[in-house]
């Protein structure tokens, strides 16, 4: 805080920057104005740099005072000037594909014929040995039981006069 000026220094600088009491010729007056404006600008620059130096000194002082004790006790993490430690980024999820999933089915979903063939041969439709698929397990549990399907809602759509088409509802 050494950059602050005492009141005595301020009055001295004001006295030096004030205009002389005797009138000057126009050429000398403009020259005197430019020198006073340059002096004022120089003083403003000096005050600005002194202010910046004071701010830096205060920041350093508070940073040194807060190092050992406050940072350990500071749970909220605010105001200490320290940065939060960043967590390491987790690797993005990558799907794991197995070729057996794509090779065996030949496309589409499983039909009842496929399930029956898999249960009679003892093979699973997913080609994984030692594991039973849900479809294969369900087919083994049924063993010829008749299961009724869910009721399906049908919507009738008219395509024009005298034409209608039935479409099953996708519920």
UniProtKB/Swiss-Prot annotation:
Biased amino acid composition, Basic and acidic residues: 1-12
Cellular compartment(s): Nucleus
CC annotations in GO: nucleus
Highest taxon listed in the record's lineage: Eukaryota
InterPro entries: NPR1/NH1-interacting
Pfam families: NPR1_interact (PF15699)
Record region (Disordered): 1-45, 65-94, 119-143
UniProt similarity note: Belongs to the NPR1-interactor family.
Protein name: NRR repressor homolog 2
